[in-house]
């Protein structure tokens, strides 16, 4: 009976082929991202200018089978983000999520945000190279789980390919595309969903 139960349990785990959508984040001004919610805490984040999709898998939950190949899998909690899109740092700071950024695309002296300066001074955040020349060895050895880039990275497609070849998902931050000033501000909701805040 126990063996049957285990088989049943295994089948149930393996059969998680589709996500059941429960709703979407309401946005008033932002037009360049969406966040969709699914049963059991899964979230799909989409950056619309490049149609990239990122599935956030809650801690302890399986990665769903049968996903489209272009969906990047992000395992929660994200703790080793490489933040190159420096404009997003103030949003991380306002969410109290700077501790999820392990790698910086700027040196300590170039940060104007005190939380970032302090994190680098303490060694909690380390410089991992600018957008066009990341320190791949450092990122891989320290377990980078996501690179958040700005639009400049589109001029260095080889960097994106290299990061992806090391299984580091690449996300481009498009808040500067927003026409409405409050659309830019609303990107804090995107990063809130990303960091679980």
Describe the residue ranges of each PLM region.
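N-terminal ligand-binding lobe of clamshell/alpha-beta domains
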Residues: 1-197
């Amino acid at each position: 009976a126990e063996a049957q139960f285990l088989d049943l349990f295994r089948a149930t785990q393996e059969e998680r082929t589709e996500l059941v959508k429960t709703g979407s984040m309401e946005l008033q001004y932002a037009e360049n991202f969406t966040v969709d919610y699914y049963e059991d805490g899964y979230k799909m984040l989409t950056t619309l200018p490049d149609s990239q999709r990122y599935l956030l898998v809650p801690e302890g939950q399986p990665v769903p089978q049968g996903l489209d190949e272009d969906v990047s899998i992000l395992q929660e909690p994200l703790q080793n983000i490489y933040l190159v899109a420096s404009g997003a740092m103030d949003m991380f700071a306002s969410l109290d999520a700077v501790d999820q950024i392990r790698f910086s695309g700027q040196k300590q002296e170039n940060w104007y945000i005190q939380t970032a300066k302090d994190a680098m001074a303490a060694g909690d955040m380390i410089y991992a190279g600018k957008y066009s020349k990341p320190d791949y060895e450092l990122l891989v050895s320290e377990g980078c789980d996501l690179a958040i880039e700005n639009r400049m990275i589109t001029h260095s497609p080889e960097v994106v390919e290299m990061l992806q070849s090391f299984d580091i998902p690449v996300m481009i931050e498009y808040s500067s595309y927003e026409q409405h000033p409050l659309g830019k501000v609303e990107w804090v909701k995107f990063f809130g969903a990303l960091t679980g805040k």
